[in-house]
């Protein structure tokens, strides 16, 4: 087992990475101080790992309940969030009740948001079961739900007590979900660590084959990088925005097609292709680097052409973005691997990118 620490002073927490961790009672015990625990999971994950988690919690002598939600991005909304509150209130959960998010990014985001809101804040633990959630969404305290007009527009910054990333859970992950997680790994290397990007290029096939050593390194290095960024800029006042490389275009794709049509990581992968194209057009990135990025995204079995939503629709959707200011779209662009720039772009350049990178 490897442990990476997120250094946030009194709110610091560990990220435990390894195989078989869902069954480790000792990893949960230090973070559960109340008399009850509520597991939040979904209809796909509960049959796979719910019993193992409940067995791990049993020796703690706590009252354990489970809320099972429908599976998918399409359910990341108010109605589903209220199912969590319904479960907590039915079980008479109090301020010391610990929520445990067992699932991917949707479950983690909604459980964290429920924890931030219920009785104005209760503790929660992240147990991410997808590669995307292990390398990205479970770390850093971003929680929330989608709105029909924009992704993740309603939420809170609220840190977990711990992240327990069991890479053994990745063996049951569908191929599309695995590729979606690799997209976030690629993003992390591209924005923050050129040497890590080189490693990803050399090992993308090993990641596709789910080789345990490759997965463990990808999760570890991605978490190290994200932990350092979050520690420096917890609430996305500046530096942390670089983690949104590919997300401005990507969120537009998700909202434009309807949540769940493309996986988040698929949209981010394609969004990176689009952002790299725009980076070249603005004279920031060299063509050879753009081609390298496109190639590794394609090798991860991710889409490299965006849907034809139309220029006006893309622009409308990208203006409904957390980075936008006074309606001006801000893009995270690449200067070189490991070096980014947050900037606006002329509409003509964006239109040229859309013409080149969409169907």
UniProtKB/Swiss-Prot annotation:
CDD domains, per database record = DHQS
Q: Which cofactor does it need?
A: Co(2+); Zn(2+); NAD(+)
User: So, what pathway does this thing act in?
Assistant: Metabolic intermediate biosynthesis; chorismate biosynthesis; chorismate from D-erythrose 4-phosphate and phosphoenolpyruvate: step 2/7
Q: Does the keyword Amino-acid biosynthesis apply?
A: yes
Q: Which reaction does it catalyse?
A: 7-phospho-2-dehydro-3-deoxy-D-arabino-heptonate = 3-dehydroquinate + phosphate
One record GO biological process: amino acid biosynthetic process
Q: Which residues bind NAD(+)?
A: 71-76, 105-109, 129-130, 142, 151
State the SUPFAM superfamilies in the record: Dehydroquinate synthase-like
Which terms are listed as keywords in the entry?
Amino-acid biosynthesis, Aromatic amino acid biosynthesis, Cobalt, Cytoplasm, Lyase, Metal-binding, NAD, Nucleotide-binding, Zinc
Q: Looking at the UniProt record for this protein, which Gene Ontology cellular component terms does it annotate, in alphabetical order? A: cytoplasm
Q: Which Pfam families match?
A: DHQ_synthase (PF01761), DHQS_C (PF24621)
From the Swiss-Prot or TrEMBL record, state where the protein is found. Answer: Cytoplasm
User: Which InterPro entries does the record match to this protein?
Assistant: Dehydroquinate_synthase, DHQ_synth_AroB, DHQ_synth_fam, DHQS/DOIS_N, DHQS_C
The record, for NCBIfam families, names:
aroB
Q: Describe the family membership recorded for this protein in Swiss-Prot or TrEMBL.
A: Belongs to the sugar phosphate cyclases superfamily. Dehydroquinate synthase family.
Q: What does this protein do?
A: Catalyzes the conversion of 3-deoxy-D-arabino-heptulosonate 7-phosphate (DAHP) to dehydroquinate (DHQ).
Q: What is this protein called?
A: 3-dehydroquinate synthase
Q: Which organism is it from?
A: Burkholderia ambifaria (strain ATCC BAA-244 / DSM 16087 / CCUG 44356 / LMG 19182 / AMMD)
The record's gene field reads aroB
């Amino acid at each position: 087992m490897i442990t990476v620490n997120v250094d946030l002073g009194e709110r610091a927490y560990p990220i435990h990475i390894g195989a078989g961790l869902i069954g480790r009672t000792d990893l949960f015990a230090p973070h559960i101080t109340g008399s009850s625990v509520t597991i939040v999971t979904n209809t796909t994950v509960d049959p796979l790992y719910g019993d193992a988690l409940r067995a791990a919690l049993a020796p703690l002598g706590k009252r354990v309940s489970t809320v099972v939600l429908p599976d998918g991005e399409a359910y990341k909304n108010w109605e589903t969030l209220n199912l969590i509150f319904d479960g907590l209130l039915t079980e008479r959960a109090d301020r010391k009740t610990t929520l445990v998010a067992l699932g991917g990014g949707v479950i983690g985001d909604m459980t964290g948001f429920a924890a931030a809101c219920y009785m104005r804040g209760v503790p929660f633990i992240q147990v991410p079961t997808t590669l995307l959630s292990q390398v990205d969404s479970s770390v850093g305290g971003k929680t929330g739900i989608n709105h029909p007009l924009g992704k993740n527009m309603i939420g809170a910054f609220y840190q977990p007590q711990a992240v327990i990333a069991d890479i053994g859970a990745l063996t049951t992950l569908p191929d599309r979900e695995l590729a979606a997680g690799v997209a976030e790994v690629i993003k992390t290397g591209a924005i923050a660590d050129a040497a890590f990007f080189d490693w990803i290029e050399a090992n993308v096939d090993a990641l596709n084959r789910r080789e345990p050593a490759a997965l463990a390194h990808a999760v570890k290095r991605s978490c190290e990088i994200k932990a350092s960024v979050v520690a420096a800029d917890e609430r996305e006042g500046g530096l942390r925005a670089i983690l949104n490389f590919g997300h401005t275009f990507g969120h537009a794709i998700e909202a434009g097609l309807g949540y769940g049509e493309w996986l988040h990581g698929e949209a981010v992968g394609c969004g990176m292709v689009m952002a790299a194209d725009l980076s070249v057009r603005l004279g920031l990135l060299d063509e050879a680097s753009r081609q390298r990025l496109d190639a590794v995204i394609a090798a991860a079995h991710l889409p490299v052409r965006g849907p034809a939503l139309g220029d006006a629709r893309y622009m409308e959707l990208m203006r409904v973005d957390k980075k936008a200011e006074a309606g001006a779209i801000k893009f995270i662009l690449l200067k070189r691997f490991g070096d980014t720039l947050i900037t606006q772009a002329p509409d003509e350049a964006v239109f040229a990118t859309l013409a080149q990178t969409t169907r």
